[in-house]
Regions:
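Phosphate-binding glycine-rich loop
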Residues: 1-13, 228
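A short helix->loop->beta-strand "cap" motif at the edges of active sites that frequently abuts
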Residues: 12, 33, 86-90, 117-118
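Helix C-cap/helix->beta junction micro-motif
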Residues: 31, 86-87, 207, 241, ...
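Active-site phosphate-binding strand-loop segment of PLP-dependent enzymes
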Residues: 38-111
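Conserved core segment of the aminotransferase class I/II
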Residues: 113-194, 198-202, 281
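Conserved glycine-rich beta-strand-loop-beta hairpin in the small C-terminal domain of fold type I
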Residues: 175, 190-201, 211-224, 255
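PLP-dependent enzyme catalytic core of the Aspartate aminotransferase-like
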Residues: 227, 236-246, 251-284
């Protein structure tokens, strides 16, 4: 994702949702770009829409979202594509978690929207769909229709100059993902993580804790109980349940008072963690 910024001017204005995957912000801070924040809140379902957005040259959209688990519908993304066209902006669409989408009407790709090829770049990774974390293998779609094909040519030149591809053995592993056997195993893994998410969600439901995500995403985004702050809840959960999660505040100011749990884990450990969380919450 960070390599794409080589295609853009340093004086471009960047729009990111808040809370946000920190890399989007850090990449642009290091480049000296101006960053604008678009609040993603419980009131807008953690899916901010362009009618709330200021002008910007580049907007980041991650759907299903990290950290909130919220997922845009195709209809909602149509509005973002229209906004990008009206503002002569580029959408950088992070589809790393698209494999978790299961509900009809929710988007797995920005290119499900007509006209998106004129305004959007999509990035996806094998790290989530196939457990390829650390191998740095993924793919980027830079359409010919975007900026008259200029960005496509620039991206090809950039990649052949600065990056000659991941190791061959990794590429062959990625190729295996798309075989019948590979897709079957991946579906089994996805079902495994979905089951973990359901276990966590059930524990939170029984404890009366508000949350979103977990259905089309591996992440569950919960509101900290008793108006605790994110870090306060982190300390409390560690002390009383011996469970670790991620404080929402680490993803931006709008993450204050929220907390992220993940379904990426062993099933038995997830059940144990969920039981501990439920028991600890019962003492409040």
């Amino acid at each position: 994702m960070g390599n794409l910024l080589d295609l853009f001017s340093q004086d471009n204005t960047i729009l990111v949702p808040d809370p946000v995957y920190p890399v989007y912000v850090d990449d642009n801070v290091m480049a000296g770009r101006k960053i604008l924040y678009l609040p993603a809140t419980a009131e807008n379902g953690f899916l901010p829409m362009p009618d709330e957005a200021p002008h910007a040259d580049i907007v980041y959209i991650c759907s299903p979202n990290n950290p909130t688990g919220a997922t845009y519908s195709v209809e909602q993304l149509k509005a973002w594509v229209a906004w990008a066209k009206a503002n002569d902006a580029v959408i950088l669409f992070d589809a790393a978690y698209e494999c978790f989408v299961s509900e009809p009407g929710l988007a797995r790709s920005i290119f499900e929207v007509e006209g998106a090829k004129e305004v959007a770049i999509e990035v996806c990774s094998f790290s989530k769909i196939a457990g390829f974390t650390g191998t740095r293998c993924g793919y980027t779609v830079v359409p010919q229709a975007l900026a008259g094909g200029k960005l496509n040519k620039m991206w090809l030149r950039r990649q052949t100059t600065k990056f000659n591809g991941v190791a061959y053995v990794v590429q062959r592993g990625a190729e295996a993902v798309f075989t019948d056997e590979g897709m079957k195993e991946i579906q089994q893994n996805l079902d495994y993580y979905r089951a973990n998410a359901a276990v966590i969600a059930a524990a939170l439901d029984e404890a009366g804790v508000w949350y979103c995500g977990g259905k089309n995403s591996p992440y569950i985004w919960l509101r900290c109980p008793n108006e605790m702050g994110s870090w306060e809840f982190f300390d409390w959960l560690l002390e009383h349940a011996h469970v670790v999660g991620t404080p929402g505040e680490g993803f931006g100011p709008c993450g204050k008072g929220y907390f992220r749990l993940t379904a990426f884990g062993d099933a038995e450990r997830t059940k144990e963690a969920a039981a501990r969380i439920k028991a600890a919450l019962a003492t409040l």
